[in-house]
Amino acid sequence: MVVQAPIQLPFRILGETADLIAIDKPPSLLIHPSKPGGPVTLWDRLRELLAYEIASGGQVSLINRLDRETSGIVLVAKNAQAARHCSMAMARGEIAKEYLALTVGWPKSEEWSVREPILRLGEVEDSRIWLKRGVHPMGVPAHTDFRVMKRIMHPKVGPISLVHCIPHTGRTHQIRVHLTHSGYPVVGDKIYGPSEGCYLEFIETGWSAALAEKLWLPRHALHSCSLRVALDKVQHSWNSALPDDLLRFLIGSPEGC
């Protein structure tokens, strides 16, 4: 009898039901393959993990997606019925998602909301980064609520904040765009941080000491920390704590006011 080695998962499983599985995605793990022969992705390992469900006719579907550098909760449906239910719930705004972000600066208010439309900037102006978004009156409606959880004086960066973010719509880069629009960009953000040149430099050279001086972190400090959805009248919820790389960044940083 051939005994197969256990699958080495590059992520943690937060919880699983007959219909759903919640994944805690680490930073820098791609969701989908970007090119043939590229690095292992979350989708690759999911298909291995759920091989039995797939072989039995199951339809594995990602309910939400995270940018490569964003860490945290990714919800996966294990069959077509659950995928359809969750997709409809998402469209109705009935899947509650929450994030934690480390931002540059101390916001003037403890809580604030941003209701500003977002579009891809290349649609209305010259942009060196095709995927870059921005606030623009011709964009689609977007709404995010923010609350300051902690103000910190970081020894390298200066004033930074731990901000709780609740997106009520699901636009690409929404939280990052709305935080930058508010004047408090996400720490480590190559596109919406100090200069979009950081992103272009990273594409050209990879992570470097020069970029570390400008960005402080090799990835943007955004983490999906909570997700809730009801399925068949049962409320499901999952939580994910701030990951180690962001916690290490905060070590030795005295709390501010």
Model-found features: residue ranges?
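RNA pseudouridine synthases
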Residues: 1-257
